[in-house]
């Protein structure tokens, strides 16, 4: 190497200030520059020296000057603290790499010459050494041309280290000028900037400027003990340098740590995308206590026994990771940076996620009633996926058809749809609940095998492992689909058999047209023992009805969607670590930026991609015409979900057929009477319009389910808080209603207490206040109520009636004691029922419509939608894992409450009217009848009257179960015997009717046509003479923990 390469290039003056020309900068190429698409920088960053400081010491050297550098690359800004000695080290590293590469090139020439002479092959090679203890070992990447242009002149660094005599101000000023000049040297050329040495100096990596992971924070080499040896990119295990082995010990592994808003990621090296580990910060552990004002910390320095070791630890959830670096100063920097990244501010309801939509941040929501529209919307979203799909559920069936009739849409079967997307390169992550097989028959192992065999891009985990975790009683109950971090679906609908339904809630499908094979589902009659022959019927369609399914689901866009994705990532990583820690094909996931909570960012810009713009007046409501809250006529770009544009002509008329005169009519037939938009289509009652809303994700999780440091019960807190603050009206649909009053010590959730207190407050204030609750008429488990194998059904009935109407513990008993008959003015309970013929000219049958919704609407302004039931399992946080969303309207329509003007929310009001129109059998022109939900004309004369009339008709025609007049097991057996004698065959809940009624001689079908909608009264006195419905000692359920049932 010629000595002239060490001389100052043209443009450097004798005053020591570097003034590089563009030509000189271009000639200084970086060593080990990454080629092509592997570069970190694709344009030059900018750097400025903010300040220069000198130590307080008389023995001063310019090498001790400290520089605060502010750097900017595109929209990313970050600050570095560097000493002059580190800059000198950078310079020597660049020079050394140039020498090594030239020697390597000469060595190859000598090797070829010796080989051509046939003498011997050179053994060994130039060994690379690390520049400093926290550098990484990376392979060299160079070309012949790049070697020629890799000179970084040594004299360019001399002004930084040249001894300076004079006043401190002069030293600092000249140091600033010299440093700025040297920064200009290696920041003026992309090859130099993308070198390993410069990227390490700037503390950047592949993740630094990935916008989806948020702002640029601290990065650098650390060593960790909990990882195995890291394999290098060439297959060689990446170990510590020789001089570090004695320092750290062979069990410590060097990794590149990347701190981002909300998580700490450990990579193999800065230029590798391989994620070795990740800690997603657990906000619950940061809440602290009211007694202590000290801010809890994520990181803290560790006192090492060896004074030459410098360590710290990071704690999040149930994990603690120990790390080491090369100096005490770096430990302090890391501890400070991690604590700043996890700085906590409390969230409403104690949730991990903040309220979204307070500004115009893109938070939007859309509701779906029943599986028909929800499944089609999910299918549409999956079809348009481009990068990643996350899915989790209590039960998932790969052979589920997302659009019906099923024979017309084979490509929209779930497994086929996922296979298509996986082959297109979309990564699909599916998290299944691993059931206790003796208790449940959902066969998640079969689902896992089917899904794994689809394609290598489909990754599947089942969790928990019951033996190792000790978790036998609780389940993962969330129902989530997330597509490209852009849209997510949550609510009550699992992607499994039995859930697909329409507003008609047909009870028959013979021959199969809508519900193939085991999708013709009635768990009251029979649960399949095997799900492998999915197209084979479990039930005789000519004898047994299916059990119709009523549910509510929603889609979310914007930051709420990414909060849901953060929850999925947390659960996935927790399951991966516990279930498949050594499975290389199952990766860890990193949360995207919008999943990161604003408190992690402090005063930083919250959204790098598109900063949120505050509304002009966020407190000013947006008032819409009432019909806008129902219109589905938005442009396609506003609603990127599937809105059915036409109805299959034969779809509505096949199968049974419920022909009752009270059924909802086509909106088009009453357009002259309706105040709705003319664009309302046939499905107006099943899908809402995409709306700007305030949304907050709430959940139930704990250490076993998500690895959190303590249980989160934000769903429970949200329910209680919203009930307490309701002004006029609460509407609840839920699969269960099991709760306790304050004096209750068995049932621990306090939803019932909140309702009780709110009703008493309304009574004391003499104000109109209504609570309407819709739940299943019977638990959706196999077995007749009097059957020996139906202990689960009876146990659930026990706890539910204990909450609703039984003496001593129930809300109705306690309210009746204070209010008497006025109790029903405040609160009432209902169920849903449907009827039809099992096939053309077949028997008349009925079945309860199984209410599986997990919904609460408050004052037509706030809606809670999710997976959580009202029971201890779902609400306490330490049991089943759940997720939900509180949706608060930002756009309003004029309505009324008890005859007074009321601004109802577009989302909540339209959803409530959709549900009520379905339950009451209203058509489009009758929406005004339910505009005011609490006035007597609606609540008593329409809602309660319709339920009572329908109930009386069903009792007259079927004498079906449950029945207000059946109050003991003896009466139940008597009723069952009479029906079987008359009909010869009936269902487990007496669901078959004679063609003509002997009591009046009337045609049963004609009488049933007098019903309207599906609403019926909940039988409060059913089995009330049976003191205890809990399992007896001769039943296996007796030996199960009681908490399983409530």
From Swiss-Prot:
Lineage top rank: taxon: Eukaryota
Alphabetized GO MF terms: phospholipase D activity
Expression sites (tissue/organ): Expressed in seedlings, roots, leaves, stems and flowers. Highest expression in roots. Detected only in the meristematic regions up to 4 days after germination and then at later stages in all tissues.
Domain PH, residue spans: 215-343
InterPro entries in UniProt: PH-like_dom_sf, PH_domain, PLD-like_dom, PLipase_D/transphosphatidylase, PLipase_D_euk, PLipase_D_fam
EC annotation from Swiss-Prot or TrEMBL: 3.1.4.4
Active site residues of this protein: 477, 479, 484, 852, 854, 859
Compositionally biased residues, Basic and acidic residues: 653-667
Catalytic activity: a 1,2-diacyl-sn-glycero-3-phosphocholine + H2O = a 1,2-diacyl-sn-glycero-3-phosphate + choline + H(+)
Disordered: region residues: 653-677
Pfam family, one: PLDc
SUPFAM superfamilies per record: PH domain-like, Phospholipase D/nuclease
Knocked-out gene: effects: No visible phenotype when grown under normal conditions. Shorter roots less sensitive to exogenous auxin. Reduced gravitropism. No effect on root hair patterning or root hair growth. Defective in the hydrolysis of phospholipids, reduced capacity to accumulate galactolipids and premature change in root architecture in response to phosphate starvation. Decreased accumulation of phosphatidic acid in roots under phosphate-limited conditions. No effect on the concentration of phospholipids and galactolipids in phosphorus-starved roots.
Annotated ranges, domain PLD phosphodiesterase: 472-499, 847-874
GO biological process: cellular response to nitrogen starvation; cellular response to phosphate starvation; galactolipid biosynthetic process; intracellular signal transduction; lipid biosynthetic process; phosphatidic acid biosynthetic process; phospholipid catabolic process; regulation of vesicle-mediated transport
Stretches assigned to the PX domain: 45-205
GO cellular component, one term: membrane
Function recorded in the entry: Hydrolyzes glycerol-phospholipids at the terminal phosphodiesteric bond to generate phosphatidic acids (PA). Phosphatidylcholine-selective. Regulates vesicle trafficking and auxin responses. Required for the normal cycling of PIN-2 containing vesicles. Contributes to the supply of inorganic phosphorus for cell metabolism and diacylglycerol moieties for galactolipid synthesis in phosphorus-starved roots. Involved in root elongation during phosphate limitation.
Family matches, as PANTHER family: PHOSPHOLIPASE D, PHOSPHOLIPASE D ZETA 2
Name of the molecule in the record: Phospholipase D zeta 2
């Amino acid at each position: 190497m010629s000595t002239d390469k060490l001389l100052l290039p043209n443009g450097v003056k004798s005053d020591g200030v570097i003034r590089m020309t563009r030509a000189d900068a271009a000639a200084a190429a970086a060593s080990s520059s990454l080629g092509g698409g592997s570069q970190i920088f694709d344009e030059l960053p900018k750097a400025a020296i903010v300040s220069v400081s000198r130590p307080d010491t008389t023995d001063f050297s310019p090498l001790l000057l400290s520089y605060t550098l502010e750097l900017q690359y595109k929209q990313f800004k970050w600050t570095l603290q560097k000493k002059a000695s580190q800059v000198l080290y950078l310079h020597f590293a660049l020079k050394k790499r140039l020498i090594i590469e030239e020697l390597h090139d000469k060595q190859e020439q000598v090797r070829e010459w010796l080989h051509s002479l046939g003498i011997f092959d050179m053994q060994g090679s130039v060994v690379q050494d690390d520049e400093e203890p926290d550098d990484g070992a990376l392979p060299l990447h160079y070309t012949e041309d790049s070697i020629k242009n890799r000179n970084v002149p040594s004299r360019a660094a001399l002004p930084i280290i040249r001894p300076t005599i004079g006043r401190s101000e002069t030293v600092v000023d000249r140091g600033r000028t010299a440093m700025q000049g040297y920064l200009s040297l290696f920041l003026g050329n992309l090859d130099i900037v993308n070198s390993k040495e410069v990227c390490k100096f700037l503390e950047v990596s592949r993740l630094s400027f990935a916008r989806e992971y948020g702002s640029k924070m601290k990065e650098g080499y650390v060593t960790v003990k909990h990882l195995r040896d890291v394999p290098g990119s060439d297959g060689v295990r990446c170990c510590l340098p020789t001089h570090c082995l004695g320092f750290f010990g062979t069990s410590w592994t060097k990794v590149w740590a990347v701190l981002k808003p909300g998580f700490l990621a450990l990579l193999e090296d800065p230029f590798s995308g391989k994620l070795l580990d990740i800690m997603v910060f657990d906000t619950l552990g940061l809440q602290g206590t009211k007694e202590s004002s000290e801010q809890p910390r994520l990181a803290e320095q560790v006192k090492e026994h060896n004074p030459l070791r410098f360590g710290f630890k990071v704690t999040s959830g149930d994990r603690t990771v120990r790390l080491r670096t090369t100096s005490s100063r770096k430990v302090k920097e890391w501890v400070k940076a991690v604590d700043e990244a996890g700085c906590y501010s409390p969230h409403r309801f104690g949730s991990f996620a903040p309220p979204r939509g307070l500004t115009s941040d893109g938070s939007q929501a859309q509701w779906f009633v029943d599986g028909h529209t929800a499944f089609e919307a999910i299918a549409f979203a999956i079809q348009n996926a481009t990068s990643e799909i996350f899915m989790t559920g209590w039960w998932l069936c790969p052979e589920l058809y997302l659009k019906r009739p099923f024979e017309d849409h084979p490509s929209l079967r779930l497994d086929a749809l996922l296979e298509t997307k996986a082959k297109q390169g979309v990564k699909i992550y599916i998290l299944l609940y691993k059931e206790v097989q003796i208790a449940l028959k959902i066969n998640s192992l079969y689902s896992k095998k089917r899904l794994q065999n689809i394609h290598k891009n489909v990754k599947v985990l089942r969790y928990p492992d019951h033996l190792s975790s000790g978790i036998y009683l609780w389940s993962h109950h969330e129902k989530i689909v997330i597509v490209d971090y852009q849209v997510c679906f949550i609510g009550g609908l699992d992607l499994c058999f039995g859930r697909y339904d329409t507003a008609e809630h047909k009870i028959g499908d013979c021959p199969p047209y809508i519900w193939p094979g085991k999708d013709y589902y009635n768990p009251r009659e029979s649960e399949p023992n095997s799900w492998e022959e999915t197209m084979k019927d479990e039930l005789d369609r000519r004898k047994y009805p299916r059990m119709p399914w009523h549910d509510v689901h929603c889609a979310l866009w914007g930051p709420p969607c990414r909060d849901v994705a953060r929850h999925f990532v947390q659960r996935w990583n927790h399951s991966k670590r516990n279930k498949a820690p050594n499975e290389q094909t199952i990766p860890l996931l990193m949360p995207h930026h919008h999943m990161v909570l604003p408190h992690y960012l402090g005063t930083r810009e919250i959204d790098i991609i598109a900063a949120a713009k505050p509304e002009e007046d966020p407190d000013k409501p947006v008032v819409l015409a009432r019909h806008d809250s129902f219109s589905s006529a938005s442009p396609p770009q506003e609603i990127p979900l599937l809105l059915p544009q036409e109805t299959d002509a034969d779809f509505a008329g096949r199968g049974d057929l419920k022909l009752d005169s009270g059924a909802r009519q086509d909106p088009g037939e009453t357009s002259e009477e309706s105040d709705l938009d003319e664009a309302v289509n046939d499905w107006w009652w099943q899908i809402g319009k995409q709306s700007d809303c305030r949304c907050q994700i709430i959940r139930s999780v704990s250490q076993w389910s998500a690895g959190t440091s303590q249980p989160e019960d934000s769903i429970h807190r949200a329910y209680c808080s919203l009930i307490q603050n309701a002004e006029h009206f609460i509407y609840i649909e839920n699969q269960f209603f099991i709760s306790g009053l304050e004096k209750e010590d068995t049932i621990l959730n306090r939803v019932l207490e909140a309702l009780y207190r709110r009703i008493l407050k309304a009574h004391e204030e003499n104000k109109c206040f209504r609570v309407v609750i819709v739940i299943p008429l019977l638990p959706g488990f196999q077995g007749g109520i009097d059957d020996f194998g139906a202990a689960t059904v009876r146990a659930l009935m026990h706890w539910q009636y204990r909450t609703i109407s039984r003496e001593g513990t129930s809300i109705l008993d306690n309210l009746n004691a204070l209010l008497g008959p006025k109790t029903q003015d405040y609160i009432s309970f209902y169920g849903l029922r449907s009827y039809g013929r099992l096939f053309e000219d077949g028997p008349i049958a009925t079945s309860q419509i199984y209410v599986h919704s997990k919904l609460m609407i408050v004052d037509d302004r706030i809606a809670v939608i999710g997976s959580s039931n009202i029971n201890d399992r779902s609400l306490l946080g330490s049991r089943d894992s759940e997720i939900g969303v509180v949706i608060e309207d930002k756009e309003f329509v004029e309505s009324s409450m008890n005859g007074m003007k009321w601004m109802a929310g577009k989302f909540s009001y339209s959803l409530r009217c959709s549900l009520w129109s379905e339950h009451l059998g209203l058509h489009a022109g009758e929406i005004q009848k339910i505009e005011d939900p609490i006035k007597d004309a609606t609540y008593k004369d329409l809602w309660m009257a319709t339920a009572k009339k329908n109930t009386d008709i069903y009792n007259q025609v079927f004498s079906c179960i449950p029945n207000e007049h059946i109050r003991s097991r003896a009466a139940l057996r008597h009723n069952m015997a009479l029906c079987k004698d008359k009909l010869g065959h009936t269902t487990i809940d007496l669901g078959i009717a004679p063609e003509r009624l002997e009591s009046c001689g009337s045609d049963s079908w004609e009488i049933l046509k007098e019903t309207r909608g599906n609403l019926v009264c909940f039988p409060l006195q059913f089995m009330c003479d049976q003191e205890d419905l809990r399992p007896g000692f001769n039943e296996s359920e007796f030996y199960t923990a009681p908490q399983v049932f409530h």
